[in-house]
């Protein structure tokens, strides 16, 4: 299966060793931006690693990529669990284990500046009718986002702006444009 996996480290307390952050340059209609990203993967065992990494690196923009698995199989709640964990941790100001002293200090008031929610595999789930709505800026009306409404309302209450968009990473459709538009929030 082509999902992200990380090796464990440590003798007594096993912790996942995260990949190094990488710099990428994205371009869209004359705009350029360098982003520093780290692909942590969506497995439930990596959720606390997300939070630790966000706080340690003082991440300003959180990009969450979901797909349409929950539309195909209603029992698959991986995407909802991941976003729910992130929103609840930000709302409760949860401090994950393994933070440095500086990270614990930063965690007291940490909140990202924005969240970008990208629905991947648009080539599989987006119909021509919803493509027209996407062009008009109403992509959030698609049923793929219905299961995330509660978390999006919570983020709104926490004053964290959210940009919702559709992408197809397989074909490179709207990936860089969606990120650039998300950074403009």
Task: Enumerate the language-model features and the residues they cover.
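P-loop NTP-binding cores centered on the Walker
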Residues: 13, 37-38, 69
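Extended charged low-complexity segments that act as oligomerization/scaffolding linkers
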Residues: 113, 159-168
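Switch I (effector-binding) loop of TRAFAC-class P-loop GTPase G-domains
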Residues: 1-32, 45-47
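Active-site-proximal beta-strand elements of phosphoester/diester hydrolases
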Residues: 32-42, 166
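Conserved C-terminal guanine-recognition region of P-loop GTPase G domains, centered on the G4
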Residues: 54-56, 61, 65-158
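Conserved beta-strand elements of beta-rich interaction domains across eukaryotes
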Residues: 41-43, 70, 122-124, 171-172
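Conserved GTPase G-domain signal focused on the G5
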Residues: 168-185
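Conserved catalytic network of the ASCE P-loop NTPase/AAA+ motor domain
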Residues: 7-8, 26-30, 43, 53-59, ...
């Amino acid at each position: 299966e082509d999902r992200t996996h990380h090796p464990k480290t440590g003798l007594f307390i096993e912790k996942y060793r995260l990949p190094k952050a990488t710099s990428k340059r994205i371009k869209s209609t004359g705009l350029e931006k360098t982003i520093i990203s780290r692909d942590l993967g969506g497995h439930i065992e990596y959720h606390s690693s997300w939070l630790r990494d966000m706080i340690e690196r003082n991440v300003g923009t959180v990009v969450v990529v979901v797909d349409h698995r929950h539309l195909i199989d209603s029992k698959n709640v991986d995407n909802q669990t991941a976003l729910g964990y992130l929103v609840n941790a930000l709302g409760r100001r949860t401090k994950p284990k393994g933070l440095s002293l500086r990270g614990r200090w930063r965690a007291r008031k940490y909140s990202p500046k924005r969240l970008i929610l990208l629905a991947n595999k648009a080539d599989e789930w987006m119909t021509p009718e919803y493509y027209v709505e996407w062009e008009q800026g109403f992509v959030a009306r698609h049923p793929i986002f219905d299961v995330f409404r509660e978390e999006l309302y919570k983020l709104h209450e926490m004053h964290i702006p959210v940009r919702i968009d559709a992408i197809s990473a397989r074909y490179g459709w709207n990936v860089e444009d969606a990120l650039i538009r998300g950074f403009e929030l």
